[in-house]
């Protein structure tokens, strides 16, 4: 077999093998993206459930004589793209309960006999165009400590809304209305197309004790 015929055979072989190899690679990348989307959705659900649970329990009172009118504090115009933040307090519950880090709420983890949880966005150190969702709570010495719940966050919006409106209209008032709307936007970058995709989750949460 001459050199030319060898080169021709190799070229034809490469031409025949390349399409199925490329197809296999594309399928594997797509499968990886689907797995990453599922994992991201699970992480978003987990973060939103921790936030929703804290909102539902905020304002709990052991005694009717205690005051809870400031146990839910929503702040707007945060440092990252004007994002919102929410601070949540309650009396120490008699039943088993956990904070946003998975710690059991106890007397040591209180200030003035109230538990404390704070959710807000903090700009990412490695990516200035995104933020991390931060959860603050109290340690056993009653001091603040924090943990990251979610990365690549684009916004966190929290508002009191009108629970009697069909579309849960956002209200400008800061006072309790019985229903809070929380929306969280997270960026996901496709590894195949390199295109950014925004994944949003919205929840309406009713505080039980306010």
Regions found by a protein language model. Give the residues of each.
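Aliphatic-rich helix starts adjacent to a transmembrane/signal segment
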Residues: 1-60
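Short linear sequence signals and composition-biased patches located at protein termini or domain-edge surfaces
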Residues: 39, 77-79, 92, 141-210
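Short, glycine/small-hydrophobic-rich surface segments
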Residues: 33, 55-83
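Surface-exposed loop/linker segments characteristic of extracytoplasmic
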Residues: 71-159, 198
